[in-house]
Amino acid sequence: MSSTRIPVIALLAAAGRGTRLGGPIPKAFVTLRERTLLERSLQAMLTSESVDEIIILVSPDMETYARDLLRKRGLLNDPEGVRIRLVHGGGERADSVWAGLQAILLDDATPDAIVLIHDSARALTPPGMIARVVRKVHEGATAVIPVLPVSDTIKRVSLDAGVVVDTPNRAELRAVQTPQGFLLSELVAANKKFFADPNPGFIPTDDASLMEWYGADVVCVQGDPMAFKVTTPIDMMLAQRITDEAEPTIFEVPGD
């Protein structure tokens, strides 16, 4: 748990259907070596010793399943002094995050609280990376994202004709991961503005893009290849191989 007086609250997104993974259940509840992706993401948050509360965003039809699962694992009894609770997510990611923020606001959280938003499908995220994001917000950043350099050449393509428009300079491009960290007051203000606008002009694919739209500076920290998102069957094969070979070391806390 965080030793600072400023609370750190994590929103763990687990409401997505995960159709690209090809399974019959939401991907957060897909099992990887006897533990669901949700459990693994939750454990990484706990092991990071950086959070005071974790809010799991689930679809209403999965709430009972999720609650029973976490209760069996002893994860609803404030493990390590961290409060864990379930909140209904929405149809889109932005809706789920807004539901989580409203739950935080109902608890009268301090405006300078730190909010982490994390994809449960990034189940092998190292705890040290989580701590790194939190630390950067503590240092004064309003919005923080973990990133990695891209190795592929990226093309911008016209959506209608499928023709290459240009080739961005790869040195300026980064692949963005989660958890992303934010100052609560600024994240709430950005969401209020977005949901009040009948025509915001875009659909945010992550929370940092919403903060960019709002006008906030988004600061980057070093990401980690282990924080990849389990989205497709190939991703799951990779995650299985990694856990088969490196399970005992995945949740060790690096000294960074």
Curated annotation (Swiss-Prot):
Annotated site residue numbers, Positions MEP for the nucleophilic attack: R170, K229
UniProt-listed InterPro entries: IspD (IPR001228), IspD/TarI (IPR034683), IspD/TarI_cytidylyltransf_bact (IPR050088), ISPD_synthase_CS (IPR018294), Nucleotide-diphossugar_trans (IPR029044)
Pathway assigned to this chain's UniProt record: Isoprenoid biosynthesis; isopentenyl diphosphate biosynthesis via DXP pathway; isopentenyl diphosphate from 1-deoxy-D-xylulose 5-phosphate: step 2/6
Gene3D superfamilies from the UniProt entry: Spore Coat Polysaccharide Biosynthesis Protein SpsA, Chain A (3.90.550.10)
EC number per UniProt: 2.7.7.60
GO MF annotation: an example: 2-C-methyl-D-erythritol 4-phosphate cytidylyltransferase activity
Site (Transition state stabilizer): R20, K27
EC main group: transferase
Reactions the enzyme catalyzes: 2-C-methyl-D-erythritol 4-phosphate + CTP + H(+) = 4-CDP-2-C-methyl-D-erythritol + diphosphate
GO biological process, one term: isopentenyl diphosphate biosynthetic process, methylerythritol 4-phosphate pathway
PROSITE patterns from the UniProt entry: ISPD
Signal peptide: none
Keyword annotations from UniProtKB, A to Z: Isoprene biosynthesis, Nucleotidyltransferase, Transferase
Free-text function comment from the UniProt entry: Catalyzes the formation of 4-diphosphocytidyl-2-C-methyl-D-erythritol from CTP and 2-C-methyl-D-erythritol 4-phosphate (MEP).
Record-stated family: Belongs to the IspD/TarI cytidylyltransferase family. IspD subfamily.
Full protein name: 2-C-methyl-D-erythritol 4-phosphate cytidylyltransferase
UniProt source species: Corynebacterium glutamicum (strain R)
Encoding gene (name): ispD
